[in-house]
Amino acid sequence: YISAEIAHERISGVVLFVNGPGGMITRVDVLEKLIRQSPKPIVAYITGVCASAHFWFVSACARRFVSSPMDEIGSCGVVYTFQSFKEYYAQMRIEIEDSYPDSADRKNRAYRDNEEKQDDTLIKENLSFYHHLFAQTIARNLGVKYDAQDPLFRGQTFFADTALAKGYVDAYGSLEDAILWVAAQKTVKRANKMI
């Protein structure tokens, strides 16, 4: 939908109404890039939580408004939730066995190591890769230096006042303020063309 709105000649920008704790990492980088490279302003209106995957793509917005001191922003981190149903199936007397050809011995290796050996080394390697991308993106979009020891890059969330003071969001405002900001950008763009 965002691509269609950006392409529409009568739409001057987009306001994202954000209240989300994050979620799946899949394609959040693609959404972030779309927002960052948009020729029209895309603004976030945060009301509640803007964490993890939501924080990832919102960091690319041209402006980030918060609605309340209770808004939470941040959680630059990743998590992998592993669920094993092996014991449950055993209790139900259901036997499940996976077979792999010798030529695909690396298939599902991270999952298998965790399940069979309680070794999450490969999972953590993958998570480190994702977290590095996430942290570098946040640093670039917020214009801050990446520091692995900074709580911002270690998964901490911040209430709105702190996030505002640190530059992670831009201003307090209402949904109407966000809409007016987008509309004003079109006026500024037109005025700059006239000068």
Where are each of the predicted segments found?
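Short acidic-hydrophobic, aromatic-tinged amphipathic segments that line or gate anion-handling sites
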Residues: R64-S67, V169-D177
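Small-residue-centered hinge/linker elements
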Residues: Y1-K40, V49, F55-N141, Q185-I195
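Secondary-structure end/capping motifs
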Residues: F134-T162
